[in-house]
């Protein structure tokens, strides 16, 4: 069987060597992301012939989803994945496939899999220019929303993340959790946000805090997927301030124009979140698929 281990901070830079970041756009290829959510989603990886295999495990440590291997011997690693699944429990599912991954898998193993779309996991990707400028008729409503915010709240301040305002960013995140106490992700998000702030200097983490009347009311954190794609890992705001999400989104995008694209991640199957992400006119919706062996 493959020997899986949980991702540690010391693994992040080593694992990056196996990804072709000229092609990567998905948030699942952001290894800082994998590290931050390692406990919540029990994310592990194994090496095989200069190739890595990432998996998601159940609480009992059984594997529920294999990711597409990446490295020099993808086909060989997939054959090893098939053996591994059979030796463990016979539960083979390859998850989070992009259209490109799906095509590669089908070419390597024609007719072996059925493919099930996973829309709740698709990434919404925008040009940084669109989010920073909100130019044109498509963004008319967004510009109006932001203008209304600034007319309503006259004492506002936007600060990029620094040692002096990390506490304020965490304060917003905690207040957001208190407003959303039915969200099972809440406590794990606070842990991940705190860890991400601690690692900001080492992994090119950027962020921002928005203030109204000197009170922190919104925060955001992001990290680099590739030299052309930036990932928005977290964005939290206090809902009593109408327009606050539009403002923090727009102001932070203005600091990211050196990147061609901004990935605002998935909608998790939440209709309200889906509507919000679509309202910003993504230029790419990165499809996701799960591959399940055909029944013989």
Indicate where each model-derived feature is located.
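Acyltransferase donor/substrate-recognition loop-hinge adjacent to the catalytic core
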Residues: 111-182
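Conserved active-site alpha-helix within GNAT-family acetyltransferase domains
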Residues: 102-116, 144, 269-285
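Short secondary-structure junctions
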Residues: 4-5, 26-28, 45, 111-117, ...
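Short catalytic-loop micro-motif centered on adjacent basic/acidic residues
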Residues: 93-95, 159, 261-264
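Conserved donor-binding loop and adjoining core beta-sheet/short helix segment
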Residues: 29-101, 211-239
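A mid-sequence, solvent-exposed acidic-amphipathic segment
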Residues: 163, 167-229
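Amide-forming acyltransferase catalytic core, primarily the GNAT-like/NAT-type
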Residues: 1-49, 185-188, 201
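Aromatic (often tryptophan-rich) hydrophobic motifs at membrane interfaces
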Residues: 207-294
């Amino acid at each position: 069987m493959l020997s899986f281990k949980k991702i540690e901070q010391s693994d992040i830079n080593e694992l990056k060597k196996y990804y072709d970041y000229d092609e990567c756009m998905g948030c699942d290829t952001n290894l800082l992301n994998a590290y931050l959510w390692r406990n919540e989603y029990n994310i592990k990886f194994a090496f095989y012939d200069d190739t890595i295999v990432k998996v998601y495990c159940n609480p009992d440590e059984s594997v529920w989803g294999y990711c597409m291997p990446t490295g020099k011997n993808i086909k060989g690693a997939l054959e090893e994945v098939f053996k591994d699944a059979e030796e463990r429990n016979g539960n083979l599912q390859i998850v989070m496939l992009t259209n490109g991954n799906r095509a590669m898998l089908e070419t390597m193993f024609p007719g072996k899999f059925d493919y099930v779309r996973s829309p709740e996991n698709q990434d919404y990707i925008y040009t940084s220019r669109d989010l920073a400028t909100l130019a044109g008729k498509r963004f008319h409503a967004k510009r109006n929303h932001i203008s209304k915010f600034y007319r309503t709240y006259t004492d506002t301040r936007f600060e990029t993340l620094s040692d002096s305002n990390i506490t304020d960013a965490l304060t917003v995140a905690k207040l957001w959790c208190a407003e959303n106490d039915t969200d099972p992700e809440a406590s794990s998000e606070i842990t991940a946000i705190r860890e991400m702030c601690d690692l900001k200097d080492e992994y090119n983490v950027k962020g921002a805090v928005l203030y109204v009347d000197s009170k922190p009311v919104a925060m955001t954190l992001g990290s680099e997927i590739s030299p052309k794609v930036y990932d928005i890992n977290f964005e939290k705001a206090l809902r009593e301030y109408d327009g606050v999400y539009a403002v923090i989104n727009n102001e932070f995008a203005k600091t990211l124009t050196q990147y061609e694209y901004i990935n605002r991640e998935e909608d998790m199957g939440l209709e309200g979140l889906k509507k919000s992400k679509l309202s910003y006119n993504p230029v790419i919706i990165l499809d996701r698929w799960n591959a399940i062996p055909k029944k013989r």
